[in-house]
Every structure is written in C-alpha cells, then in structure tokens.
Regions:
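Pair of pore-lining "gating" transmembrane helices in MFS-fold secondary transporters
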Residues: 7-41, 109-110, 203
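Cytoplasmic helix-loop-helix junction between adjacent transmembrane helices
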Residues: 107-144
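Paired small-residue
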Residues: 20, 91, 102-111
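Helix-to-loop junctions at the C-terminal end of transmembrane segments
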Residues: 62-77, 160
C-alpha cells in the first residue's frame, strides 16, 4: 500500500473553495427553475417563443466556451471561475425582474455564458487541487454540484410556496450568491495554472 500523502492547509482550503463554487453553480441555476412558469405567464410568452428563449442558454454556453481557455491562460482558473460565477448568479436579478421578453432573454443568455466559463474554470482549478492531493477527488466536486442543484430547487420551491415575489427571491439570491462567489477567491490556489511554482503551492 502507498502511504497517503500529506495535504497542506492551502490545498485543503482550495478544496473547500472549489466545493463552494460547484455548490453555487448548481444552486443558482436550479433556484430559478420552479419560478419559470410564473415568469412565462407574467410576460405572456407562448410555448413556441418560450422554447426559443430557453434555447438561448446552450447558445450562451457555446459562445462563452470558445474563449474560456484563453481567459484561463491570461488570468488563471481561480480568477475566471470566481468572476464569471459572480456574473452568472448576478443575472438572477435580471431574470427575476425582467419586464419584457428581451430582458429575460438577455438574462438567460448571460447567465448561461457565465455558467459555462465558470464550469470549465472550476474544473480546471479542481484538477490543480487534485494534483496536490495526489489522489482522485474531482468526482466529489461534481457531487457537490448535485447537492447545490437540489438545494437551489428547494429554495425556489419554498419561495414559491411561501408567496415570495420572484423579483425579491432573485434579488436576495443574487446578492447572497455573489458574496459567496467572491469569498471563494481567498480559498483558491494563487498564481497562474501553467506556472510550475504556483502548481506546487501548498504552504
């Protein structure tokens, strides 16, 4: 048997930072889903146009995915993940307060674009942390995404059942999620991903 390698405090902190990003990523996206029928009804959007509007989400992700690698090389996976997670969750406020269909479309597109950038960057950072642990831990991060999605769905459902206005739910959720996303930065590994010294950071 091989001995379990020592894990530094910095690596442990970074693991919790990545966990927080994965949890937020799942929670933010799922929190608005229970309110979609109300939004659709409020804006008087028929089924055909609603389907096209929701299709903007994968389009936003596709467009954002084209530039993610370049952004990570320029700024680091930690910075890209945190900044675009904050941007993505902030779009909840735009979605929840949309008074016309184009505002909702913009919110859906931008949230999905930020989500795609975050998804790639937080996985890249998770791989950095995994290298410090010297054992597979990446799957556990995806487990936390699933937990976040369940929590977000429950949050949205509870707000709906409790009669909380959509705009208020989204405003509070966006504010709280942005603070949490920015707070994750202090936990993550410093330096650029391609910097050998940064990759070994663990003290």
């Amino acid at each position: 048997m091989h001995p379990i390698p020592d894990v530094t405090p910095a690596a442990r902190r970074a693991r919790w930072g990545v966990i927080l990003l994965f949890w937020l990523n799942g929670a933010a996206a799922a929190s608005i889903i229970p309110r979609y029928p109300e939004i659709k009804s409020r804006l008087v959007i028929d089924d055909q146009w609603w389907g096209l509007l929701i299709a903007l989400a994968p389009l936003g992700g596709l467009v954002a995915g084209l530039v993610t690698a370049a952004l990570i090389r320029r700024f680091s996976s930690a910075t890209v993940a945190v900044v675009f997670q904050a941007v993505s969750v902030a779009m909840l406020s735009l979605i929840g307060n949309a008074s016309v269909a184009w505002m909702l479309a913009a919110g859906v597109f931008l949230m999905a674009a930020g989500d795609a950038l975050t998804d790639i960057a937080m996985n890249a950072h998770g791989l950095r942390v995994q290298r410090l642990y010297q054992r597979p831990i990446l799957n556990s991060f995806h487990g936390w995404w699933s937990i976040g999605a369940v929590c977000g769905g429950l949050l949205g459902s509870a707000a709906k059942q409790g009669g909380v206005p959509i705009w208020l739910q989204c405003l509070i959720a966006a504010g709280a999620f942005v603070v949490m996303a920015l707070g994750a930065k202090s936990l993550l590994l410093p330096g650029k991903d391609h910097d050998p010294a940064a990759s070994q950071a663990g003290g």
